[in-house]
Amino acid sequence: MPKMKTHRGAAKRFKKTGSGKLKYDRAYGSHLFANKSTKQKRHLRKANIVSSGDFKRIKSLLVYMK
């Protein structure tokens, strides 16, 4: 049976935390900041944790993530 492939798009977007959860950067945080409030920009700086409902689906894309 051939080796499973890691989904490269998911590998670039998700990192594993020390406790085993997956974190990712929020959307809308790369440009066009003049149109965003200070509060919105502050919240965009903090990474988000993958919800339990999505965890299994995303973990299947990252087959070799330890």
UniProtKB/Swiss-Prot annotation:
<keyword id="KW-0689">Ribosomal protein</keyword>
<dbReference type="InterPro" id="IPR018265">
    <property type="entry name" value="Ribosomal_bL35_CS"/>
</dbReference>
<keyword id="KW-0687">Ribonucleoprotein</keyword>
<dbReference type="InterPro" id="IPR037229">
    <property type="entry name" value="Ribosomal_bL35_sf"/>
</dbReference>
<dbReference type="GO" id="GO:0022625">
    <property type="term" value="C:cytosolic large ribosomal subunit"/>
</dbReference>
<protein>
    <recommendedName>
        <fullName>Large ribosomal subunit protein bL35</fullName>
    </recommendedName>
</protein>
<dbReference type="InterPro" id="IPR021137">
    <property type="entry name" value="Ribosomal_bL35-like"/>
</dbReference>
<comment type="similarity">
    <text>Belongs to the bacterial ribosomal protein bL35 family.</text>
</comment>
<dbReference type="Pfam" id="PF01632">
    <property type="entry name" value="Ribosomal_L35p"/>
</dbReference>
<dbReference type="GO" id="GO:0006412">
    <property type="term" value="P:translation"/>
</dbReference>
<dbReference type="InterPro" id="IPR001706">
    <property type="entry name" value="Ribosomal_bL35"/>
</dbReference>
<dbReference type="GO" id="GO:0003735">
    <property type="term" value="F:structural constituent of ribosome"/>
</dbReference>
